[in-house]
Amino acid sequence: MAKVQKLPLPWSECICPICQEILLEPVTLPCKHTLCNPCFQMTVEKASLCCPFCRKRVSTWARQHSRTRTLVNKELWEVIQKQYPKQCQRRASGQESDDLSDELTSCPVPVLCKPGEIRQEYEAEVSKIEAERTAQEEAERKASEDYIQKLLAEEEAEENLHAEASQREIEEQLKRDEELARLLSGDMDLSNASCTSVSPVTSKKVVSKSSKIVKSKQRVSGDIERFLSPKPRRALAAFGINESRNSDTSGSCILLDEDEDEIPDLSPQCPSTSLIQERDVELPMPYLPNCYKLESDAASQQDSCSERNDICNGTYSCSDSIDVEVSKTMEQQRATADSQEYRMETNAMSYSTPKRKCEECYLDIEEKAGSCQSVKKKKLSLSEDSPVLSVHAGKFIELEENLYERRKQEEHDRLFALQLQRELDKELKQVNRGKGSPDEYQLRPKRGLKLQECNDSPLPHNEQTPVQDKGGNTQSGYSPDENKKPSRKKSITSSQVRQSRAVTNTERSSEGMNVLKPSNKQPTILDLFQRSAGK
């Protein structure tokens, strides 16, 4: 509430600036503007809860004071009543004072907004709200970035822990693998040592000590190298000849076996040393295929053991694997060729005596040379026949492929022909009733034209009438083919005959009806005269 000035109050302060009359129950707004209660009710409450002079919003103040009934400035109202009781009484009774117009003083100038002032206020408010919103978004973005960085740091720490754990597991696994490899290598060494220490089974021929030492050294030291770089057949033959030279005087040629369990005897077929020195390249080493099979089986077992050992120790490479595969394929081819040679030789020698003394086995140098040449020729013939066999096999494969393709095409053509035949049968079964087709629908001719034709051309008496069967179908005669359709001309003539007979029947019936029909028409005088004249 505004402070009331001391007495006496000037007349200008007791006049309402809106109605220009004395203040009746004055209301002092928070902006220090005063107006009477009726003007406040009309302008502020009904129009807008703002001051009519400065446009300050007074909605909260008005609701609060109207609730407590303290809108009227009672102190100012009491002062005005004491100073101007007559004017207050007139205003309360509704009478207008005459002397108010003469005593008008200067009213406060209404305050108006400058051009663009409201727009500036609006833009300032909008910019303020926008700045607050951007500041809030920036704060939220910073908080989210901090949270994301925290999560990333936690994930990175977890990944590091996981990587360390996996690395430890890998290291432990490697250690375990190394221990296992050491154990396996120790077992392999023990097994090799036991194999070398085991004496061979009782046999007819005994190998000399020097050959045993050579074999044990070769087995212990060159297990893997023997498979990685296989020896040619000539070297094997020379090695076998040297072994036979160091053996007993019986002259038997002994092949080195991996297991040394069975050492079969061979017939003395080795040539003399001079011939071997001269033809070291050409002569093959005599051997038995069974021994070779046993040797290859033992070699394959040692191969697998050596490969496992290399894999466990981590020294097995791609080049070694390729060499092993190549050596295996070469050994297999060699085994097949040698088995064929041996079969041919055994077939040729089956008619000769199997056992002879050592002295009778040796032939002359010329005969030996001829036998060596014959063996060489056999080898060459086998080597020449092998590509021929491969060519024939390729031709057979091509012929089989061509035959298979031809049969496949014939089956495809047969299925296609069956499909076409089905479609053709379906088309033949369907009856075409379209215009211009042989089975088209016959249109009814006009009745007047038919009657004229019937009257112009009377039917002959000897014409054969169509006979109807039980199904109602007309038959002009017997036809052997039941499915044969009647011709178009016959069907037209039969329809004409039926129509002409119907017309004659209708004419006769109409004449009879005219005779029998009673005359409902009243007779005229002329009819009566005609009847009387007729009688």
Swiss-Prot record:
Origin species: Xenopus tropicalis
Zinc finger (RING-type) residue numbers: 16-55
Enzyme class: transferase
Organism phylogeny: Eukaryota, Metazoa, Chordata, Craniata, Vertebrata
EC number per UniProt: 2.3.2.27
Pathway recorded for this protein: Protein modification; protein ubiquitination
Biased composition annotated in UniProt, kind: Polar residues: 462-478, 492-507
Catalytic activity: S-ubiquitinyl-[E2 ubiquitin-conjugating enzyme]-L-cysteine + [acceptor protein]-L-lysine = [E2 ubiquitin-conjugating enzyme]-L-cysteine + N(6)-ubiquitinyl-[acceptor protein]-L-lysine
Chief location of this protein within or outside the cell: nucleus
Domain free text: The MIU motif (motif interacting with ubiquitin) mediates the interaction with both 'Lys-48'- and 'Lys-63'-linked ubiquitin chains. The UMI motif mediates interaction with ubiquitin with a preference for 'Lys-63'-linked ubiquitin. The specificity for different types of ubiquitin is mediated by juxtaposition of ubiquitin-binding motifs (MIU and UMI motifs) with LR motifs (LRMs).
Similarity annotation: Belongs to the RNF168 family.
Name of the protein described by the UniProt record: E3 ubiquitin-protein ligase rnf168
InterPro entries xref list: RNF168, RNF168/RNF169_E3_ubiq-ligase, Znf_C3HC4_RING-type, Znf_RING, Znf_RING/FYVE/PHD
Gene assigned in the entry: rnf168
GO BP annotation list: DNA damage response; DNA repair-dependent chromatin remodeling; double-strand break repair; isotype switching; negative regulation of transcription elongation by RNA polymerase II; positive regulation of DNA repair; protein K63-linked ubiquitination; protein ubiquitination
Subcellular locations according to the entry: Nucleus
Molecular function as annotated in GO: chromatin binding; histone binding; K63-linked polyubiquitin modification-dependent protein binding; ubiquitin binding; ubiquitin-protein transferase activity; zinc ion binding
Residue ranges, annotated region (Disordered): 429-535
